[in-house]
Amino acid sequence: MGPAFASAALALSEALNLPSSGEADFVLQVGTEGLQLQELGPHAPGPLSVDFVRGPLAHRRLQGGGSGQMIAKAVGIQPGVRPDVLDATAGLGRDAFVLAQLGCNVRLIERHPVIAALLADGLQRARLDPDVRPIIERMHLQTGDAIQLMNAWEGDPPQVIYVDPMFPHREKSSLVKKEMSMLRPLVGDDLDASSLLEAALKLATHRVVVKRPRKAPSVLGPKVGYVLEGKSSRFDIYPKRSLKP
């Protein structure tokens, strides 16, 4: 590790209050590919990082379905309407990036400091790419507990709040399997999803959207207004007001 990377690793260790050496099941490593989360062990998968410039997100950016994508319909994107969105469970930022690419201003909240650090690193590196920078400039990350932050919200509230809780059963793609196998031991399941929904419904001015596995029950709370369903997942939509141009 070069001096610059060693210095960055030490600073990150201090910021996250993590040991810089010793026994561990996971390590954060800093290098030419940015910040990576690596599981240790003989059968561990490869490192996990956030990359908005290359890989699946680049393909989706260049070849994706535009405003016809189900997530776009779920948050209310339509001609002349690009709602202000709060992604209350940002994770690795994939869905927020899609919405920002489509023109939405997206505020992201991620409560786990390691996941937030991976996301912040991905955003920082993506700003160096001239094609992706305009998208990233519409994404604004905050680390903290979404329920607390929403309950103490100051300023203009978001029109739409998007929630994607981590539940025991998720999509079966190889990418998601890898991500879940690494993230679940760190963050666990979102056992406070109903409280998250309650806070979101109080704050959002127009609608709340909850992403769920297609066959999973709805989050405990108010009745779902309507559902958009795909092959492996669905969006439960709780409308409050119509989004209009």
Swiss-Prot record:
The keyword Methyltransferase applies. GO terms for cellular component: cytoplasm. Its EC number is 2.1.1.242. It catalyses: guanosine(1516) in 16S rRNA + S-adenosyl-L-methionine = N(2)-methylguanosine(1516) in 16S rRNA + S-adenosyl-L-homocysteine + H(+). It is found in: Cytoplasm. GO terms for molecular function: rRNA (guanine-N2-)-methyltransferase activity. InterPro entries: 16SrRNA_methylTrfase_J, SAM-dependent_MTases_sf. Belongs to the methyltransferase superfamily. RsmJ family. Specifically methylates the guanosine in position 1516 of 16S rRNA. This is Ribosomal RNA small subunit methyltransferase J. It comes from Dechloromonas aromatica (strain RCB). The lineage of its organism: Bacteria, Pseudomonadati, Pseudomonadota, Betaproteobacteria, Rhodocyclales.
